[in-house]
Amino acid sequence: MSEVKAVATRDSYGNALKALGEKAENLVVLDADLAGATKTSVFMKAFPDRHIDCGIAEANMTGIAAGLSTCGFVPFVSTFAMFASGRAYEQVRNAIGYPHLNVKIAATHAGISVGEDGATHQCNEDLALMREIPGMVVINPSDDVEAKAAVEAAYNYYGPVYMRFGRAACPVINDTPDYKFEIGKGITLREGKDVAIIATGIEVAYALEAAELLAADGIEATVINIHTIKPLDKELVVAAAKATGKVVTVEEHSTIGGLGSAVAECLCDEYPCKVTRIGVNDVFGESGPAGELIKKYGLDGQSIYEKVKASL
């Protein structure tokens, strides 16, 4: 594991943009008066002529990005997840998704870990909304290393991509020599025979914590990092279900429509088995420190451990 203890993936996004901008002259970045918060300010300072601040007009920004993509540019649209998937949904669907344009949507401040900003800014529905758009790739990186890799992979992929980044710092878990990011391919971080914990985003680190606690009780858990919600790595999901017979999904997102739903849909078709979904249970969030909210909504390592044990 890296010596870097924790990094917010929104910071990873900003740094990755700058690094990519040095070699990709057709990369342009659009923001909606949030360059400081989304960390696109890092790119803006390095390449001011390729950064466009559209003001507080997310729908217009999305349309501008669509137009730029038809002129040979690769636009990265940047704003909070609530605005990217909510306020601009119609434009994302019709202006980017429908014509399958080469636009990348970077949504920061996702999930309840937004913290004190409260329920109106804690988007726990974005993965569901974006997953249902035909042809949209949906990525939810688990840490700094993965977020940077996702940005480059998104740039190299032709078509619409939605990427989810967080405000709160999270542990770096992928800083290993053999780490490889590939769109649509999950990563097995730990193998066990008793249960498969399939996690995404910041919950991957918490899933690993839970697996350690389970191991102390003699329960061997497989832990899988699904960084790409769509296309889902169905082969890996089915293999884990066959090997353990019990699957638990964990996400900092509603239990409706996100990773849990995607995994359940896959196994319903391919290998029916018990699936327990851990996430935000059909409620709005509230204002508070990110760490406290993670615990309150049962998404920390201890809570996951308890819920996995109860499901066995």
Question: Where do the language-model regions lie?
Answer:
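Thiamine diphosphate
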Residues: 1-164, 169, ...
